[in-house]
Amino acid sequence: MLDMTFEQFNSLNFKLYDGNPVIKNPLNSFVIADPSVIEAEYSPDGKLHLFAHGFFGVYHYISDDGFNFHKFAKVAVNAMRPNINYIEGKYYLFYEKTRPVIFNFLSMFGGKWESDIYCIESTDLVNWTEEYPVITHTRDYEDFGKGHAISNPFLTKFGDKYRLYYSCGQTFIEDCGFGEPTHISFAESDNVSRGYISLEKPIISPDESSLHLNLCSGCLKVYHLSDCYIGLQNGIYKRDGKSHSGIVLLKSDDGINFEYIRDFLSPQMCGDNKWMAQYVYACCLSKQGNKLRLYFNARNTSSNVTGRESIGIYEADI
């Protein structure tokens, strides 16, 4: 839980870090995306650990200061959209498990896409267990075309229950040439690693009348404040004939029904740098000393040829 009220959070003055992007796409991938962070106070070595995905799996980065990162290891293959958690002395890394890259590529041309939520565990962020399934296909709303997609895991605790938010389904975004998640739902369990039961219907779906998710829902990250829950959602929307994505701030009393509050971080030019000009995607909120930092990934353009995704920071004093 973040020890602040909604009013306090909403009044914070977030600013983009001047040194963005802090992690650029690697040479073997056009993207580095979906950052998830373990703060130094919860890590075994007193450093900040960040997990993100490229074309060929989930990668582990380490930083002494939260700004300068070096790649440490690849921790999962055929995997994307990680979510790292520290619970009672153990690290749980959830992610979207896909089929091999060639099958993902063929899904763009009518092939079958299949993905589910898997997890690996560690006590030191170095040695990991074998992966195991956590959420698999059980609901019709997870379907699309010939397959199904379950993605963007994000774990929270609600009383005695573990709640794993996830995105599902896929909507093809024409100008990008790839799919983005259609719906957002969650599953609950008494056990952090197994026994999750998904809702019978999603909690967020695309809305043609919305300015923020008229194409599809993207993903949702939920944080517990002292008086409510907030959601940071990056829906996918069409505006001026092009697709875009931006992060919006949502508010909820129960973590199920969310109210739109305001745009939180929108695509924009950063001087002459176009790195976040068209899309701002998934994020992770991290408290570091007297700073609240939002790690996020963004994309310069919808073009499959020149499009690149990198990771940046949006931060505020607290």
Enumerate the predicted regions with their spans.
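Active-site lining segments of carbohydrate-active enzymes
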Residues: P153
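Beta-rich carbohydrate-recognition and catalytic domains
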Residues: M1-H148, T156-L213, Y223-M276, K287-I318
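C-terminal structured domain segments
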Residues: Y281-C284
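A carbohydrate-recognition surface predominantly in extracellular/luminal proteins
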Residues: G218
